[in-house]
């Protein structure tokens, strides 16, 4: 039996060795079809995207729409999407997910850039995959990490 999930997202429960977790197939299909490239956009697991105001959302979506031949994979809360459904539906090149396997997306050959908050894990995964970053630090160590990333030639802020 195939389950479109990831064991990391499941609670402890009885299971069977006949279950195969196949979560992430949708992002793989998007990336495979992104012949002109894809950009990953994530501010990590601690950032609450429901706090983004309408002006910020419109700015982000407007920028993404201008690059219609590039696919954008955005980690964004479903509440944010549902509250702004028309805006998200108007950009067929923007693909929203509440969760995805970030290293797998970064390691895909069609991933061209990573818009990130510069959390330590994101910076490390991006460097390992060789994907340039566009850093937008929000709090904590992210400001330092972003400076280190820029200094080391991993991207810009």
Predicted regions and their residues:
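Catalytic core of nucleotide-sugar-dependent glycosyltransferases
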Residues: 1-157
């Amino acid at each position: 039996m195939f389950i479109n999930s990831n064991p990391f997202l499941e609670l402890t429960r009885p299971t069977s060795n006949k279950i195969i977790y196949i979560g992430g197939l949708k992002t793989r299909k998007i990336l495979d079809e992104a012949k002109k490239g894809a950009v990953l956009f994530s501010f990590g697991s601690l950032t609450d995207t429901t706090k983004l105001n309408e002006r910020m959302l419109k700015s982000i979506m407007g920028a993404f729409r201008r690059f219609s031949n590039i696919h954008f994979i955005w980690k964004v809360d479903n509440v944010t999407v549902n509250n702004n459904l028309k805006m998200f539906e108007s950009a067929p090149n923007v693909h929203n997910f509440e969760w995805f396997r970030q290293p797998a997306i970064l390691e895909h050959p069609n991933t061209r850039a990573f818009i990130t908050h510069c959390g330590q894990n994101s910076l490390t995964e991006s460097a390992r995959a060789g994907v340039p970053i566009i850093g937008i630090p929000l709090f904590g160590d992210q400001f330092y990490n972003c400076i280190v990333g820029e200094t080391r030639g991993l991207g810009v802020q």
